[in-house]
């Protein structure tokens, strides 16, 4: 099939793009990488009156390190650029790893961060990573600019807090902790995940081996994707870890507690029961990888600061 007729407009500025959306309320769509929109146009699942091309807007580009250790990432940043950016790998390695899991090379070269977030596919990697990182989504519209916590941005299947006349402009990512894990299961490389988990572990107290106590001085954020209608905080698993160590035993118990928070779909690729089982296994794996990274990095820093003559 081919798209239904539409008018094409290439915006020359953010203000012009907003005006074009406002001129066709509810009947305009933004074109960035087109990796989700174009197939939907071809299948006539969407029939916009106007297609507003925003690819020329410099206001939506760039990966900028922030003084606090975080990042500001423009909405037009391609997945491949996220994966290859030294700044992202250093300051938000979970996000870089998630970007490497997106589709195939052609999709990563064309698809954009903003497009993935605005489309809000519940099996997509980048939304889950940004919820785990406690990022903030910046949007601009006729009423001005506002910020939305990533956890509140995704409201359901292909549904976000973005108004029809607003444009997602950038994402603010806070400085990431040393402990993180990102795991997913797909039928083939490049396929949408049957299930996946993103984990971030922050510990505010001195390093304690062989395990780390979280309690009130640290935080663990676990987010499942492909297991509900949006990126889901696995709060049951998080509660298991409150005030205790992260080790093989607690990771396994946290994994078991993740299942009840999930409401996965069932289809020809995997039953709901199977996807829920995947969530329990992947939660355990993501936690153990997070702790391995955290302890490894903190051990390196600790050893260098105390004993290395070259530090």
Regions found by a protein language model. Give the residues of each.
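C-terminal structural segment of proteins
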Residues: 1-214, 218-294
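Positively charged, low-complexity/disordered segments
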Residues: 296-311
